[in-house]
Amino acid sequence: MAVGKNKRISKGKKGGKKKAADPFAKKDWYDIKAPSVFSVRNVGKTLVTRTQGTKIASEGLEHRVFEISLADLQGDEDHSFRKIRLRAEDIQGKNVLTNFWGMDFTTDKLRSLVRKWQSLIEAHVDVKTTDSYTLRMFCIGFTKKRANQQKRTCYAQSSQIRQIRRKMREIMVNQAQSCDLKDLVQKFIPESIGREIEKATSSIYPLQNVFIRKVKILKAPKFDLGKLMEVHGDYNEDDIGTKLDRPAEEAVAEPTEVIGA
């Protein structure tokens, strides 16, 4: 009787099954440091592939943009509708030093502001700060009923909308051109520009919910480490590392004279 091949018995593959490589084994965690204008400085961590040969880890992190809620940066839930963009500018040790790179509204907040029986007024303008950052600022505002108004609607006329838009641009330019980026961000957080626009346009038509809803950075100046360290004002040496004393073995011993040589 011929002995046939048992097809059910499968041969084992040579070398066995390959072990899946852990994708995190070749990566490092870095701390993201926010500028000093925000209350919370250590805002999170980011991953980057470890330095291998000519591929340097810090180059992979350079100019990486992080989007963080202003509520997390300020520790206040009232600011949760605003998103802040921070760009990695420099890497020191395991810390990524960032700078402001724009902001925006959350979609749900923007949709909640738009209602019936009122006029929506928008304006945008390109401005240059004193430290040579070129920004595009977008402003939004809504008309509201005058005091003791019985009429259901509060629509502004086209001529009034043009006047309000002109006033919005004028205030945005004046506020941005008179300060640097750090001071301008400090104006964005408490909505001081929106309140100024509200006050200035009250004689034309009363407004409500006036916000700088979006800021885009169109052009940034050449990188300057000194300026970045000013933005991270209270960034101390403890974050970078501690200074170590030189070991005694490394100290050069003084030659001793041998008597009788």
Swiss-Prot record:
Superkingdom of the source species: Eukaryota
GO biological process, one term: translation
Keyword field contains Secreted: no
Localisation per UniProt entry: Cytoplasm
Recorded family membership: Belongs to the eukaryotic ribosomal protein eS1 family.
Organism lineage: Eukaryota, Viridiplantae, Streptophyta, Embryophyta, Tracheophyta
Identification of the protein by name: Small ribosomal subunit protein eS1
Pfam families, A to Z: Ribosomal_S3Ae
MF annotations from Gene Ontology: structural constituent of ribosome
Signal peptide, first to last residue: none
One GO cellular component term noted in the UniProt record for this chain: cytosolic small ribosomal subunit
Binding partners and assembly: Component of the small ribosomal subunit. Mature ribosomes consist of a small (40S) and a large (60S) subunit. The 40S subunit contains about 33 different proteins and 1 molecule of RNA (18S). The 60S subunit contains about 49 different proteins and 3 molecules of RNA (25S, 5.8S and 5S).
Ranges where the record places region Disordered: 1-20
Ranges of biased composition (kind: Basic residues): 1-18
Chief place of localization: cytoplasm
Keyword list, A-Z: Cytoplasm, Ribonucleoprotein, Ribosomal protein
